[in-house]
C-alpha cells in the first residue's frame, strides 16, 4: 500500500471512529445499574435517567434498582434500557420489554464476564471500547467473611462479582461453600469457619461501628469501599489495586 493510500485508509478509520463516538453520545440510554451509569458517564455517554442509587444527583431518577418506575421509563422513549441479572428483577425486565423497549440484560459475575458484557454494552451503543485489563496482583492467601446485611447476617456466595474479585486477589470467601449466593448465617457459624479477616463493605448496607464489636472475637475487621468491591466496569482496574493495598497489611 502506498503512502497516499495508507493515509486515506487511516483517515477513513478516524472518520468511522468519530462517527461511532458521535452516535453513542446522542443515544438516549436509561441505566438501572449503578456501575453501568458510572461506566457510561466515563465513556461520555451520560444516561438520560438512572436509579437513585447511581450517585448521580444531576441525572433524572426513575426509582431504585429493585423498584424502577416502569411507566416513567417508558414515557422517556429511550433507545436502550440497561439492566443486570444480578442487580435487577426479572419482572421489571419483562415489563419493559413488553412495553416495546429495547432492553440490554447484562450478567456480570466475574472479571471475565465483565469484559464480555462491557463489549456488549459498547456494541449496543456504538461505542469503540477497548477493555481495560485488570493487572494481576500478588495473592494475599487469606480467608474472609464479607457481611452485607445484619438481622439476619448475610454474605455473598461463590457466583457473585464481589467473591470473584476477592478470588483474583488470593482471598477465599468462606461463604463460597453455601448453595445460595446470598446466604444467611449467624456469627457462631462464622466463628466456626475461622476466617482470617472480616471485610466490611460500605454498601449495600453500612454496618455501624457499634456492630463491628460483634466481630471482635472472630477476626480483625476492615472497612472497604463497597463500590470497589461490587461495582464493576471502568473502576475495576484501580479498584483491585486499592483493595489489594488496603487488605495486604492485615
Protein language model features and the residues they cover:
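N-terminal ligand-binding lobe of clamshell/alpha-beta domains
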Residues: 10, 14-250
